[in-house]
Amino acid sequence: KRQRFSMITDKDTTMIAARNLGKRVPTAAGTLEILSAIDLEIGARESVAVVGVSGSGKSTLLGLLAGLDLPSEGEVWLSGQRLNDMDEDGRARVRGASVGFVFQSFQLLAGLTALENVMLPLELAGEQDARAHATDLLERVGQAERLQHYPKQLSGGEQQRVAIARAFATEPAVLFADEPTGNLDRHTGERIIDLLFDLNRDKGTTLVLVTHDEQLAGRCERLVRLESGRVVADSRTAEPA
């Protein structure tokens, strides 16, 4: 009998829901099961860490919850919409309206300045004051002196600050962060995480954080642990940030 670890949240609205989620991929040796029987609910404004050893399925789960990929079985709901019913264009529209991303690799556009990188999602959303809004966000993350710098002119920590400003630019309902400090030294990583949680609280954004760092995970309100593609624990943390 399949165990269920879905938490009942104390938030007003369920922002993300997964029902009997599974993901399999074909390989030369046969079918590889990456995720199986995932049941999960994440409430509005909640901060949730997804932890587990390398290969446990953390990043795959994040990709499914964010609509970057489709499951082999089960269903995913994001911001009240069932992603299984949508093609890639439809899922992209949901992501554009509701979701922000912060990745380990920053993923800034090399040909754009820091300011232009943050302005881009605002302009795509049709915001008239994109420049002023982007400037304010970059000032907020401590990059006021780096507006006209290109990514190659920025340190790793500076690039991640720009990436965080870009992620929060459209005030997404949900922010997905996949190992956001993985390429940074400990001191810089701690400052980036402080910034991420500060903005998360200020904006009331739902935060889903994939990490192998147990100390970082402990700063979230809730911890979901994966082993071999299954949820084996789902609990509140003692001292959320």
Regions found by a protein language model. Give the residues of each.
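ABC-family P-loop ATPase nucleotide-binding domain
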Residues: K1-R24, A233-A241
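ABC family nucleotide-binding domain
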Residues: I16-S228
